[in-house]
Amino acid sequence: MKVILRKDVAALGDAGEVVAVKNGYANNYLIPQGMATRATEGTLKALETEKKQQARKVELQRTSARELAQKIEQMVLKVQAKAGESGKLFGTVTAGDIADALKAVGVEIDRRKITLEAPVKLLGKYEAEAKLFSDVTVKVTFEVEAEGTEA
């Protein structure tokens, strides 16, 4: 019997795949557990339209991520941090600080998607990398300034 998997099933396949299994396995386990449905003409057509909609949705997300990447590349963020007279920071600038600076200019990115190559412990200009989508990453340029200075 051919079934369409609704959930990932170990040693059988991933959700959305059409697989052939024995009748008893399908009728007594997969279908009652909600892990699969029978593969009829109607369900196969529904699966195809669902896959097309999902592909369109992913492409829209990818396009918006690329547009956001172009917007971010043109920015130079200002990050305020407490610093001594020699320019050394009290603490470090983290991905969370960069995410807050992006949020202040209207761009919201989760701090876990921002990576710094090395800890930022001095005043100056730096770059971080933000992953906006599975294949869209962007360099975020930011300048660390001492608190109290106006730009």
UniProtKB/Swiss-Prot annotation:
Entry keywords, A to Z: Ribonucleoprotein, Ribosomal protein, RNA-binding, rRNA-binding
Function field: Binds to the 23S rRNA.
GO process terms (BP): translation
Family named by the database record: Belongs to the bacterial ribosomal protein bL9 family.
Gene expressing this chain: rplI
Cellular component GO terms, alphabetical: ribonucleoprotein complex; ribosome
Disulfide bond sites: none
Lineage: Bacteria, Pseudomonadati, Chlorobiota, Chlorobiia, Chlorobiales
UniProt entry tagged with the keyword Methyltransferase: no
GO molecular function: rRNA binding; structural constituent of ribosome
Protein's UniProt keywords contain Nuclease: no
Protein name per UniProt: Large ribosomal subunit protein bL9
